[in-house]
Amino acid sequence: MSQYVVCALYKFVALDDYQEIRQPLTEVLEANQIRGTLLLASEGINGTVAGKRESIDALLQWFKQDSRLADVVYKESFNEEQPFNRTKVKLKKEIVTMGVEGIDPRHVVGTYVKPNEWNALISDPDVILVDTRNDYEVDIGTFKNAVNPNTETFREFPQYVEDNLDPKKHKKVAMFCTGGIRCEKSTAYMKEQGFDEVYHLEGGILKYLEEVPEEESMWEGDCYVFDGRVAVNHQLEKSGYDVCNACRLPITDEDKASDHFEKGVSCPKCIDKHSDEQKARFREREKQVQLSNARGETHVGGDAAHLIDQRKKEKLAHKEQQRSGKKAK
């Protein structure tokens, strides 16, 4: 049996005291040797953590002590190795960032569709199926005939809706994401924009892969996950993807065989994205990682977070430039 339980969880619920919850929650995670990241905001909790079976059970039991979190939505999968390096509880404005004020899934949300009813819905020719995830996630796998909004971050989703969807034309819209949380907000947003029939996959892709037999599945490819496994197959097992530690994008064995791949420094997707100075820093970091591994330690550097933030800013700037060009025309 796999050694670690990977638990993805969330709940939209009023947590006016979310700042006070941070410390005791951190203590529970650390006391049970649970790693991963949980986000707290006034609108609820979200995140993915991993630990031994008894540790995750202890965390879920801790949630039950607070009536607001007692029925937190969670999904489990398993892995032979701990997929996280650190334990973090972060305070945020939103537990999933859309950047639109007033969207509250607790009050208005789309219609939930069970995994075993999903195939029938998305086979309806009158339904437009929209993948609410980012483009690098869609590249790895998605549902048959799903529309890719080509978003780099979830913040761009409202603009996609404004530019491409019309409540008068698109009468039935079905949406899905990894675990369900992004669809809670995206369907709430769609309802606010006047879309009447808005559906979303209850429990997300992960629940669908868990419950729908592969021979009946309309899922194509693997599913990107936000932990060290990078992606999972239909059996919810780690698939053949790795991650480039320079750009943090998923890469295949073919990518790693490329002349543009240098472990920890570059891959075909980012070879032209970083300066020589940055690459020199990445090489030094990779050297330290290898030294730490040789000592049986875990090296946690600051470059990864910096790169993720930088990549988001660059892509947002590019999107803004594209939109400005459209308006100018």
Curated annotation (Swiss-Prot):
Active-site residues from the entry: 177 (cysteine persulfide intermediate)
Species, as recorded: Vibrio atlanticus (strain LGP32)
Entries under HAMAP family matching the protein: TrhO
Enzyme class: oxidoreductase
Gene that produces this protein: trhO
Positions of the UniProt region annotated as Disordered: 285-329
Protein name: tRNA uridine(34) hydroxylase
InterPro entries in alphabetical order: Rhodanese-like_dom (IPR001763), Rhodanese-like_dom_sf (IPR036873), TrhO (IPR020936), TRHO_N (IPR040503)
Function: Catalyzes oxygen-dependent 5-hydroxyuridine (ho5U) modification at position 34 in tRNAs.
Catalysis: reaction(s): uridine(34) in tRNA + AH2 + O2 = 5-hydroxyuridine(34) in tRNA + A + H2O
SUPFAM superfamilies given in the database record: Rhodanese/Cell cycle control phosphatase
